[in-house]
Amino acid sequence: MSEAEKKASQDAQHKEPMADSETQLDSDSAPSSQAEKPAKTKYPLSFWLAFGALCLTGLISAMEGSIVSTSLPSIIAELKAAFQPLYGQLADLWGRRYVMILATAIFLLGSGICGGANSMDMLIWGRAVQGIGAGGINMLVDLIICDLVPMRERGNFIGLLFLFVSIGTTSGPIIGGALTDNTTWRWVFYINLPMGGAALVLLVLFLQVKWKKELSTRDRLKRIDVVGNAILVGATFSILYALTYGGTRYPWSAANIVAPFVLGFVGLGIFIAWESNKRWCPYPVMPLHHFNSRTASASFFISFMTMILAFWVVYFYPVYFQSVLGNTPTISGVHLLPFEVSFPIFAAVGGGLVSKTGRYKPIHMVATSIVTIAIGASSVLTQHTHKAAWAVLQIFIGMGLGSLISTTLQAVQAGLPESETAASTATWAYMRSLGTIWGVSVPAAIFNNRFDQLSGQLDPSIRDNFVRGQAYEHATAQFVQSFEPATREVVIGAYTDALRRVWLVSIAFGAVTVLSTLFEKELTLRTELDSEFGLAEKKGDAKGDVERGEGQNDSREGGQNENV
């Protein structure tokens, strides 16, 4: 047996027993070791340079997601979800540095194709390439932070990263509008090239991290789960297609919506069967034993629901501002600032609390409860509601969702060994990305269905403008204000009623998320970094670049395992 084959056998044996030898911890109290505040890790300049490059790359990717006109098919942009597990597998085989540089280069290539597009087909293909690159960036920045920072302290840096991501998300529409008004639409894409180019240079110069080089290229290629990735991409694409066009371009009952839905979920079933077969799939792209841990499973679900509820707010508060209050898109964006500002602030606060206390379950329970109450209370908003009411509600929603976004990854990884960081981060990113498209499609379906029920109140001469998914498309102040006063009041009343249904249904989604936190256990967050992909060591420095404080726990034995 060759050395590579021996290594492969050892790796496979190392991963399988994880979920069966779990040490059960009290779910209601933190382990005693967490009560002691660990020594603060000191990070060298090389770490901060690498972290700065990651933040800039994350900012550009986030800005791309909000700068581009929503008229482009969202299925293209959301295709990135399907490739994130593959990026995780590639990062384990070829190291984080090269895969991160590759993802950034793919993103820039897609931006260049879009900017130079001379047809809609070329633009759509460019967006597909750009989205695949963005998906890798979004997953890899979190993964690399996990490689460079002990688990106990990751919340601090993930929260800081989300500050940059939120800057990109918030500034995107403003920059996009300014570029479109003063130059050409092509600069909406070209602007990524100088900024992304600078980020790429920083990554090449400062992202100097270790990686395993003992395998040959041939052995690495054998470890790529080609079949599993292909099935997952196909199944994800089918579901995204149905969610994107169902209720808008086609009725939900149409065969060309039902068929992709069925094929997508059948595909996911086949994917699960493939990944669980050790003979066919010795190196799964998404190890299913991660879901044997009830804490990891609950945290994956909370991550998915967090993004659903976040996009629920991001897409339907503007509908309220424009169709009910009569705000312009610009003013609507300003009115969304309480959420957009509170979200990253509390992402940093939530991450900091986990780092300080070593506990994530209480934060998840409180945060999900706050979100459920605040998003449900949005159902009382009307044309005459004082602006302080919707501003405060947004702040509370941002408080809850922000606290969740920066703390669920630690809960996922607490019961897993460090060797599975890439796979668990990729699965976490995949769940979050899926949540974004469900977070638009589900409330849109509820909204349009309710508006169809209310269409009988409208004058027959205008009714066709609001049925079969058109109510959401026409939710603009310009359109609503175009009617005479009496008709306008009826239309505004219908929008208010449809939005009320959207917010009331959101309570059920929030309540399920609250209940899911009860399945989490409070596992110890490791305070010592033990990664094979940390900062590259300097010559003569066996300890590497990161200076560690005294009294840190050894994590080389892998993650804690909990009895399910």
Swiss-Prot record:
Which InterPro entries does the record cross-reference, listed alphabetically?
A: MFS (IPR011701), MFS_dom (IPR020846), MFS_trans_sf (IPR036259)
Q: How does it sit in the membrane?
A: Multi-pass membrane protein
Q: Which residues are glycosylated?
A: N182, N553
Alphabetical list of PROSITE patterns matching this protein: MFS
Where does the record say this protein resides?
Cell membrane
Q: Which GO terms describe its cellular component?
A: plasma membrane
Q: Which residues cross the membrane?
A: 43-63, 98-118, 131-151, 157-177, 187-207, 226-246, 254-274, 300-320, 334-354, 362-382, 389-409, 427-447, 502-522
Q: Where is this region: Disordered?
A: 1-37, 540-564
Q: Which GO terms describe its molecular function?
A: transmembrane transporter activity
Pfam families documented for this protein: MFS_1
Keyword Transmembrane (UniProt)? yes
* PANTHER family membership: MAJOR FACILITATOR SUPERFAMILY (PTHR23501), MAJOR FACILITATOR SUPERFAMILY (MFS) PROFILE DOMAIN-CONTAINING PROTEIN (PTHR23501:SF187)
Give the UniProt family note: Belongs to the major facilitator superfamily.
Record protein name field? MFS-type efflux transporter ffsH
Source organism per UniProt? Aspergillus flavipes
